Amino acid sequence: MSETAPVAAPAVSAPGAKAAGKKPKKAAGGSKARKPAGPSVTELITKAVAASKERKGLSLAALKKALAAGGYDVEKNNSRIKLGLKSLVGKGTLVQTKGTGASGSFKLNKKPGETKEKATKKKPAAKPKKPAAKKPASAAKKPKKAAAVKKSPKKAKKPAAAATKKAAKSPKKAAKAGRPKKAAKSPAKAKAVKPKAAKPKAAKPKAAKAKKAAPKKK
């Protein structure tokens, strides 16, 4: 009886090990099924824009219709479509003719290589400008100091000009001071004339005295 018991124990453990070995295989198969078999969003967008014959470009609404007709779920992947459009415009594969951001009309860039070359040419040209801008800034500070030195003689000239203005004003004051003297002389002359007119009045009483003396002789 003791020999049959240990033989049954290994028989039970063996199927458990086999089941554990089969589980990772199923998981591997599930991961393979999650990978998208169809083309990416950017590829679908480029195909739809290339198929359109509109001169002004394909609008966002027309692009969604074209993607929906191809079996793509537009409602669930709306954000992906917008991100795909922005990335394609940034790369230079698409050109935005109207609107801003993901909204508007889009066309295929016929010369994508030229846009990339222009972008690469502009970047190195911007780097040497930074050290060149610093040098004139230091040189510009020196002429400011020289300008401050030049301003000091201007201040010295201002008091000289003020002195000339005061000297010019002083004869006017002297002329004004001379005018009241003439006015003061004129009333003095008028006073001298008045006593002359009073003399004939004093002569009248003398004539009256002469008349009174005449009857005494009779």
Swiss-Prot record:
InterPro entries: H1/H5, Histone_H1/H5_H15, WH-like_DNA-bd_sf, WH_DNA-bd_sf
Compositional bias of kind Basic residues: 119-133, 141-158, 166-184, 191-218
Location(s), subcellular: Nucleus; Chromosome
Sites of N-acetylserine modification: S2
Top-level taxon: Eukaryota
SUPFAM superfamilies: Winged helix' DNA-binding domain
Pfam family, one: Linker_histone
Record keyword Nucleus present: yes
Any one of the GO CC terms: nucleosome
A molecular function GO annotation: structural constituent of chromatin
Protein known as: Histone H1
